[in-house]
Amino acid sequence: MRQRSGIRHRWWIGLACLGCVLHHTDAAAQGPSGGPLTLNDAIQLALRNYPAIKESRARAQAAEEGVGVARTAYLPRLDMMWQENRATTNNVFGLLFPQSTLFSMTGPVLGTRSLGDSVWGSAGAVLLSWEAVDFGQRKAGVDVARAQTSLAKNQSALTELDVASAAADAFLTVLAADESVRAARANVDRLQVFSNNVRTLVQNQLRPGADQSRAEAELAVANNQLSQAVQIAEVARASLADAVGAAGASFELTAGALTAVPEFTIEPADLTTHPAARAGQAAIDVVRARERTLDRAYYPHITLQSTFAARGSGAETPGVSSFGNGLWVQVPNWAVGASVTFPALDLFSINARKRVEAQNEVAESAHYDRTIQALTTQEVKARALMKAATEIARNTPAERQAATAGENQARARYQSGLATVVEVAEAHRLLAQAEADDAVARLGVWRALLATAQAHGDLAPFLDRIKP
């Protein structure tokens, strides 16, 4: 009885998990508004979910936080130290160059050499230092951080443009693939009817058996073409799911305004405002900001300092009263002053770094010129694509009408014995191609508009045309 109850319990858990999976799948198959996915929904999903968008935005935010890091150089520095030690008191006169290995001794020479006698020592200090005058070095560092922030933001804008364009193009590709599937399925239906008619005529010995074989072969070819069209549509949907950042999800699409051929006028664009061009210019600005930092590097540093310190020692000096066991500080001191430091020999390294940055500026300027050239070429190609797509969209209705009339006439002539099955098959093939061309031609114009908007660096005019 317990075993049967456990089995029933596992069944309920399995059904609950299956329901959660199905609910998640249904939710993923819907657009943000809960209905079929529109092109604008696809773009918004991509901008919200695609990993590259999150990465670029995070990098831009990190660069912006870097400005705050650079500004902290204006703050004073406060160092605190406390020390407890036990050591011998042997000391000698003499000089030691500054180094980090041998510890220093303070106090008079006692003339002792014993390693067995040791005392406690303590020390504490607070040092406040502030660079009062830097001749613009810290400001130059902040300017570098701001230039890097501008570069990161422009790169993020370019990423958003690329991701949104890819999502829109994938959406149009799915619509075109679905239209091709409809045309292929209509062709299969027509050829199925024609094949049945030919079979009846052959069975009644009104047509030779070769006609039936040809009709069945044409039907098989049409079915294969339908399978290929379905495959292309499924692959296109997978690409759309990836483009919107929901890989593996399935969406129901609605064409909306994309079913009609749009009316448009293409205005000339300033390619220097394209996100790619702005990112290239920002990269040049970063190099120039680093060059200005190097211009300020060969200047002195004027630092104000103040300190309070105290020490204690268990060592006894002849003629001086004892300060206790040395575990606590007993002798205080304070000091206030200013120091000037000047990196005299840094001139050589600074000049070498300037030569490096000069070549970096040449490289970034060349990259900017290449970007402008690529954008110009992209715009010219988009205009050519627009011209061809518009002409094709004007011609396909006539193509479809003529192909439909030709197919009707070929079937009628075949029924009357005035045409061969080859003529009918060719008419069917021509009609199928005409239907596919007509269905895809409208989307071709929209795709050309998308390519033009992407070349101009702004999808807003394209999205305004698809609003209901």
Regions found by a protein language model. Give the residues of each.
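Periplasmic alpha-helical coiled-coil/stalk elements that build and connect Gram-negative outer-membrane
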Residues: R2, T159-T273, L385, A389, ...
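Bacterial N-terminal signal peptides
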Residues: W12-H23
